[in-house]
Regions:
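C-terminal cap of thioredoxin/glutaredoxin-like
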Residues: 2, 7-29, 34, 109-195
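Structural alpha/beta surface segment adjacent to cysteine/selenocysteine redox centers
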Residues: 14-117
Length: 195
């Protein structure tokens, strides 16, 4: 078992989300997709923004590196005008989708819209468009995503991520509690989970 801790605002979670399903299946590792919010974790570290915005050189490097990673994967990449984006609604919808068995498709589609097309997933119309593209009743799904149990689950996921020592996304946690951080550590996490 491997927990995949992801945040839609996380750039490197995009390629991880594209790769993790096939790589896990090939190794026989079961996955649990765990959406959470980075904002509260950053705030606890004294940051009021993404470190990629706080440190411009780091941000420039990240955007160039992400473009290279996407090119290597054959995945589209368009830098969004807004970064980081407000991902609360998309994260809540992801919890509904994961509970209903279509979460992986939804998550990959959100990442494709955000980093493959440069769209703002913080805008409700973008999430509606993703849901419509998946042939889902967007109004009904969004209504379910606004319920107190879903809101509480996202809050608890974020609190659990912090309690586990997660400080960024993507992060991967194995059944024995080993933490791996970053898209470039995905294979190592899967190999550890397979042991």
């Amino acid at each position: 078992m491997l927990d995949f801790w992801f945040e839609f605002a996380s750039t490197y979670s995009y390629p991880a989300a594209l790769r993790i399903g096939g790589l896990a299946r090939a190794r026989g590792v079961s996955l649990r997709w765990r959406p959470f919010l980075l904002g509260p974790l950053f705030k606890a570290q004294g940051w009021d923004n993404s470190p990629f915005n706080i440190y411009p050189a780091k941000g420039r490097y990240m955007w160039r590196d992400l473009a290279r990673v996407c090119e290597e994967l054959g995945a589209p990449f368009v830098r969004p005008a807004v970064f980081p984006q407000n991902t609360i609604q998309a994260s809540r919808v992801a919890l509904v989708a994961l509970a209903e068995g279509w979460g992986e498709d939804f998550c990959r589609a959100v990442y494709a819209a955000e980093f493959g097309e440069g769209r703002d997933v913080g805008v409700p119309e973008t999430v509606v468009g993703v849901l419509s593209g998946l042939k889902k009743d967007a109004a009904a799904v969004i209504e379910r995503a606004q319920t107190d149990p879903i809101k509480l689950t996202l809050r608890r996921n974020t609190e659990e991520a912090q309690a586990r020592g997660i400080f960024g996304a993507p992060s991967f946690v194995t059944a024995d509690g080993e933490l791996f951080w970053g898209n470039d550590r995905l294979e190592a996490a899967l190999n550890w989970a397979k042991r």
